[in-house]
Amino acid sequence: MINTDFYLVELLVRNHPGVMSHITGLFTRRAFNLEGIFCTQIGDGSTSKMFLLVKNDFTLEQIIKQLEKLYDVLQVSLHQDYDYSIFQNLDKVLKIK
């Protein structure tokens, strides 16, 4: 199921305490709701991939520019056409009851 009402923001970030707080705080300060968050370390653990599910909004472009300026954010990708069912079935994949 492809969903165009939401965007998937994919981030490559440095992995250390406080990174997620800095990133989510940027959204909070702009009263922008995160619909979903998934984060996992990759490689040797020095970096992580974060996936943020957000509604299509006119302020998103400005937030992306601000994310790119954060020291701990190494890469930002914005995906409009993605399979939304990934987030719907994540609880089954992770075996969350």
Language-model segments: residues:
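A conserved regulatory-domain signal marking ACT and ACT-like small-molecule sensing domains
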Residues: 1-97
